[in-house]
Every structure is written in C-alpha cells, then in structure tokens.
C-alpha cells in the first residue's frame, strides 16, 4: 500500500494504491454551472460536460474542437466531455482534451466532472458512479451536501501501459 497526501496537480490531493487499484482524492467542487445544453465545472481543469445520444458514432474530435475554441471558452479553452447514460449509475464518456487537441483514452478530471454533472442533473441518484472510457472502466464516488461535492475519489485499476529501457551514451 502506497499513500501520498498533498496537492499534486490539477485538483489531485491524495493517492492511495492498494490491491492493484488506485484511488485518487480529487479537490472539492462547489460551483457547477448548468446550461440548457451542457454543464460547466472545474475539477482541477475546466470541463464542458454534454450528454448526447449514440456516443459510439459521435464525432468527438470535430465537435470537441468547436466547443473547446468557441465562446465562451475561446483561447483559454476547456476540456469537452461527451456522455451517454448506460443505466442508473453507469455512463460512457469520450473526452476531447485541450493541450492534446484530440480525443484521449481517458481523462481523470473529466470523468470526475461527468459523475458530478450526472448527479447534479438527477441522471443518477447514486454517489458511486461507474464510467466507461476507451482506456477502461473507472469509478467516481463523492459526498454531496447542499450542492457542494466533497470526499471525491476517482478509482480504477493500476495497469502497466508502457515499459522501456534506454541507454545514455556520453
């Protein structure tokens, strides 16, 4: 078991690794903007969360790019999450990530934003939300009191995705 607790980056304040699962404690969220077509919130990075139908065929790159650079985000931009509800506590997520400027396999602050937006909009009543991304399955749990989300944990499996060796020659 490995445990680290301090503000690390982008809203992450703690890490616990146990039994091949990683638990990331995320920053509290107290501001969620609701619009007719989407939600906007900052979970360590700004996230536009939009619920769509037929996520599998949705053009994440084209639509994400328009939103990321469009008003009101403009040059500062926002990550853009497209979401489809699978059942009462499970959502499929595809994310267009600023900086990468393309769809990514997974985005931790993004799935955290999706779980909170789904709860805020009453698409789920559970405080343990399952999320399916191209990179695998994740889970976000939280406490909510008077629209303030605390004790937010993102968790998923610890999987080696890359191994390399290199030789430094002088």
PLM region spans:
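Active-site proximal loop and beta-alpha junction motif in alpha/beta enzyme cores
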Residues: 1-106, 113-170
